[in-house]
Amino acid sequence: EKFNRMFPIGLSKLPGIGYILTGGISPLSKRYGLAIDNLLNVKGFFGNGDFFSLDIDNLNKKEIPIWEGIKGAAPFFSIITEVAIQTFENFPIQVFDGFVKEKELKELIGISETFPKNFSFQFIFSDNIYVYIVGELKTEEEKNLAQKYHSIFQRFPSLKNKIYRNLNQINFFPKELNIFELNANFHSEVISLLGKSLKGYESEFVEELIEINAAKPNKACYVAIQQLGDQSMFENKYSSYFIHREACWKPWIFASWEKNNNHDKKVVINWMNEAWNRLKRFFPYIHLAQLHNHLNSHQDELKLAFGSKLDELKDLKRIYDPSNILPPL
């Protein structure tokens, strides 16, 4: 704020280092890319205890595979203690948001598939559906384009329209959804998926969400989605372990239950897995934003997240975490 700069944060506002290193998808990722593609410097320790400090502009041949591994798969062979990231100048943000009906959601998904890189779409599907359309207004052309969308979105009377000074001013998802209260008596799991365009499948997708929501075991379970694409499809000078660069959508399934209630936990995890199975045809890949080495799905998730690069990751782990101190592959 002091320097009128920002970093493309996620929907939970204050990003931790885990958000950055697992990929880091923001409402502005279509313009600025993923968080891992904006890394400049990384410090930390390997699983074998050795310290490292890497700078993107001063990598030797041996360090390049390490840098690439840190971008999306760091927890398996390293502990990161410090990062330096590229920041960007702040610009006004136009937001259209509100509760919508299932039919309106289908139409909005279709409209969002044609958005330019400065606009993105995200929503949460629970007992009610709440959507966010976020647009950065950097140029006069983009301000004029925002007026065009304002006219289009007037067809959706529940959508509010507001311009914020910058992205940091926005509080995503209202308390009226009644699902975000931090409760020490509940545990949760999240599984994140990745997939290509939904063009032509908007209706089928929303119908699946309706059935998934109807089957949820409690009000704290939900499905949400973020749009990516454009700049997030491109890596910077080095590759990464976020391999599914063709992805246009990242849905996540949030599953929560009362702690120490093993029956509820089993029911909720089963619901999460069933929701995943239902959504696989639209989103066949995994964004490994949360590790599940304690769940039966861990190996499948690794394969769907890293694909053919999994063997390279195993090589990094063998070299830098030979005692398997860090999460397993």
Regions found by a protein language model. Give the residues of each.
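Soluble FAD-dependent oxygen oxidases
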Residues: 1-329
